Every structure is written in C-alpha cells, then in structure tokens.
Amino acid sequence: MSNKEGSGGFRKRKHDNFPHNQRREGKDVNSSSPVMLAFKSFQQELDARHDKYERLVKLSRDITVESKRTIFLLHRITSAPDMEDILTESEIKLDGVRQKIFQVAQELSGEDMHQFHRAITTGLQEYVEAVSFQHFIKTRSLISMDEINKQLIFTTDDNGKENKTPSSDTQDEQFGTWRLRVTPVDYLLGVADLTGELMRMCINSVGNGDIDTPFEVSQFLRQVYDGFSFIGNTGPYEVSKKLYTLKQSLAKVENACYALKVRGSEIPKHMLADVSSVKTEMIDQEEGIS
C-alpha cells in the first residue's frame, strides 16, 4: 500500500467500483414514497406533541403564579379585621386557577396524562398547597385528595366552573365533561409544601398576639408528620426530600408554642415573635452542625 492511498485506500477503491447510478449521493429521493410519507406523519405528530407540551408548561406556570398569589392573600388573615372578606376573595382567585386547570384538562382530552405529567406537576402541587391552605383556615383540617379531584370536574354548560355532581365516564362522553385528576404524588408534595405556609402563619399569629392558632397548627403538623413518617423512604424520592423540610417546620412551630406556654406570662405579646425567631435561628444552626 502506497503512502498516497493511506489506511482508507481500500475503502475508496471499493466505493469507486460501484456503478454511478447505485451510489447513495446520486440517488434522487422520492418524496411521495410510502416511507417518506410515514416519516412526514411522524414529524407532524411529534411537532404537535411538542407544541402541546409547551402550552401545558405555560398553563402550569400561570397556575403556579395565581396559586401563590392566593397563598399570599390568605396570609393576610392573621392581621385582617374581617376574615370572611379574604376567604371570599381567595375563593374567587381559586376559581380563576380552576379555569386554567380546565384548559389543561381540555389539552389532555384523549391523551395519556402521564406523558405530559412533568409539564403540569408544578402547577398542580401549588394548587393543592393553596386549596389545602384555605381549607385548613376554614376547618382546621386537611382536605382529602378526593375532595380536590371533585372540584376539578368541568362541563361545557357552566363554562368550566366546578361541577358538584361527579359524573361517570359514559356521561363524560355524552355531555362533554372534562376532568383532571391530581395524582397521589402531586397531592403529597402539595401537602408537604403546605406545612411551610402553616409555619409562617403560626409565626405571624404569635406576632399579632394570637395564642390559639400556634397550638392548633402544632397539633395538625404533628399528625401530618406522623403520616409522612409512615411513608418514609419507601415513597417517591421527592416525598422523602420534603420530609426534612417538614421536620424543620414542625420544630419551629413547637418552639413558638414553647415560647407562648413557658414565657408567655412574663413577655409582652409584641415581643413573643422576636423570642421565637431567635429560637428558630438556634434550631437552624444546630441542624446545620448535625
């Protein structure tokens, strides 16, 4: 083998032996062939799926933003003179969030939700957090996943507003009913985030001189923590990660209750929040060392 031919000389000579009409680069592509038509249909299907995914991501972002605004509104209850006005306004905001979820349900009509779950999971978790926060303020209890899903049944008659009477799958096809089911993982992650909002509500209540709310929140968080402890590391990875944050929130609430119970009689109410915040910083430092 000469130096000019190099290591690829044999391959080049072998390629030159092919007739010109059999070379790949010289062959015209028939755009109307069955293979090309099949791949064009695949391209259209993938483009439509990607476009749908992007629309769902935008809707999920809107759901997240509106749900956060509802949570911020509900935090004003600790200092507002009339709680009913804020609850009414929060219900209006949640109705707006459900209108966005109705659009998601329409986008997912006839589709496998699990293929697009990653696009909407953030918004659903934030919605669960907002609606469960409102439910706790009203009833001092935890809303169930079934109750949340019942609120996510929509019909064309009321233009997407919640339907109080759940319908069967046959009725869904007959009357044009859409529904979106919150998955157990979305529900658990939303409830885990709820504990952080309850911790903030507890600290704000202490600062406003409310000595009942911290103990109610503390008892509720203990029950939630016990429930998550049963799941432990056997559940989804995201749930086990939230367990540490939940434990921190519970410790801060219990510390606020300690400040109220032990030192409440000797410290003015307007200073209790400062005492609890100092204790909270000490807890964070100890957990960081450990």
Swiss-Prot record:
What function does the entry list? Acts in combination with TSN as an endonuclease involved in the activation of the RNA-induced silencing complex (RISC). Possible role in spermatogenesis.
> What protein name applies here?
Translin-associated protein X
For the keyword tRNA-binding, the answer is no
Source gene? TSNAX
Q: Which GO terms describe its cellular component?
A: Golgi apparatus; nucleus; perinuclear region of cytoplasm
The post-translation modification note in this UniProt entry reads: Sumoylated with SUMO1.
Q: Where is the composition biased (Basic and acidic residues)?
A: 16-28
Q: Which family does it belong to?
A: Belongs to the translin family.
Where is the stretch described as Interaction with C1D? 73-208
Quick one: which residues bind Mg(2+)?
A: 129, 197
Assigned keywords, A-Z: Cytoplasm, Developmental protein, Differentiation, DNA-binding, Golgi apparatus, Isopeptide bond, Magnesium, Metal-binding, Nucleus, Spermatogenesis, Ubl conjugation
Q: Which SUPFAM superfamilies match?
A: Translin
PANTHER family the UniProt entry points to:
TRANSLIN AND TRANSLIN ASSOCIATED PROTEIN X (PTHR10741)
Say yes or no: keyword Transmembrane helix present: no
Q: Give the GO terms filed under biological process for this record.
A: cell differentiation; spermatogenesis
**Which is a Pfam family this sequence falls into?**
Translin
Assembly and interactions?
A: Ring-shaped heterooctamer of six TSN and two TSNAX subunits. Interacts with GOLGA3, TSNAXIP1, SUN1 and AKAP9. Interacts with the homodimeric form of C1D following gamma-radiation. Interacts with TSN and C1D in a mutually exclusive manner.
Gene Ontology terms for molecular function: metal ion binding; sequence-specific DNA binding
Q: Where in the cell is it found?
A: Cytoplasm, Perinuclear region; Golgi apparatus; Nucleus
Tell me which domain of life the UniProt entry assigns to the organism this sequence originates from.
Eukaryota
Q: Where is this cross-link: Glycyl lysine isopeptide (Lys-Gly) (interchain with G-Cter in SUMO2)?
A: 279
Which residue ranges are recorded for the region named Disordered?
1-32
